Each structure stands twice: as structure tokens, then as C-alpha cells.
Amino acid sequence: MALAVIPYDRQAAVAYAHKWAFGRNPDFFDYEEVGGDCTNFASQCLYAGTGVMNYTPVYGWYYIDANRKAPAWTGVEYFYNFITRKEVNPGPFGVDAPLEAMEPGDFVQFRFDKDTFGHTPIIVSIGSPPTLENTLIAAHSYDADYRPLSTYFFRDIRFLHILGAYPQDTPREKPPKPPGSVEQGQPAQQQPRQPAG
């Protein structure tokens, strides 16, 4: 039985990108000093637009804490491989596509002077017709918002068009609880409730 597709909320992903482009969400570890934070930030944006993770060990796309995360959450090539996978399983999915197919909320990957791609920004604005000058991105490592693609010096570029996400369909897809966590819906006994916002 095929899983239904969850629509990708591009506006939510882009809003998240603008909110955290020059800051760090305290719910996620900052990998700036341990290889870079770009794909971690891209994954956070994508999660803001889909709300679905894939908790398959090693091959999934998930974040629990700094040490319990899938390689695809923080690794450029792993992110690409997960998003463009052919298997129908939980999590966001998409296709390698030309610049002309891009929309805000899609992703760009650059290859600089190495053999592999090494940077994953999110597209936050795109002109018509799209060009490297009017396609603007947000990123971490180095932090940017509304930065034109044309300001990067790269050897290769590829684009990821997000099509949606497959839902988590079984209880086994749920993550293990982090230490000290509280069951959803149960307030912590010793902590006052904080107002939303």
C-alpha cells in the first residue's frame, strides 16, 4: 500500500530560514566548529516545512540530539542521497532538477575545490526567469540570507526540488526518547510552563 504524500509547506521552510539564518535554534546543536552547520540548517528548514523525520538507523533522516542524528541530517552528499532516494519510506523526498524548476524552499548544493559537494543552502527567493543573480539563498557556514547564487565561486552546482514527504506510518518509526524527556502531553513536574512564542 502506497503512503500518502504530505505537501511541502514552502512558506514555513522559508520563514524558518529567515528566522534562523543569522542565529541558532537552541533545539539543535550547532556544528559550526565540527565540520560546518550548513546541512544541519538546511535539514531544520526542510523539517519546518514537512514535520516528518525518518528514524531508520544510518540510512534515515533524523535529529534527536547532537550525537543521535542520521548522516543525512548534517552531511551534504548523504542529504542529497536521502532526498533523491527511490524507496517510498517516511521523510521528505525530491528530485535533482534544473534551476528553471526551482521554487522558494528548494535546495542548492555546491562543489567547490573538492571531488564532492560541500554546501547546502536553501532558496528563499527566485526571479523570473530564474538566474544565478536573482536566485537568493539562506545558509549557515557562512551565515547568509538573501544572498545571490552568483556571489559564490564554485566548480559545480546542483538543485534539489522538494516534492513532499511520506508520513511516518508505523509505531516503529518513532524515535527513542532522549534522556530526561517527558511524554507528550504530560507537563514536567518541576518546571513551570513557558508561554508559547
Say what each PLM segment does.
Residues 1-73:
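N-terminal capping segments
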Residues 48-54, 125-128, 165-167:
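Short regulatory "switch" loops immediately downstream of catalytic or recognition motifs
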Residues 63-137:
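...with weaker cross-activation on analogous glycine-rich loops/strands in unrelated enzymes
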Residues 34, 59, 90-93, 126, ...:
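Feature targets compositionally biased, intrinsically disordered low-complexity regions
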Residues 27-36, 56-66, 112-158:
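Glycine-rich catalytic cores of cysteine/serine-nucleophile enzymes that process amide/ester linkages
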Residues 134-136, 140-142, 149-197:
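Low-complexity, Gly/Ser/Thr/Pro-rich intrinsically disordered linker/tail segments
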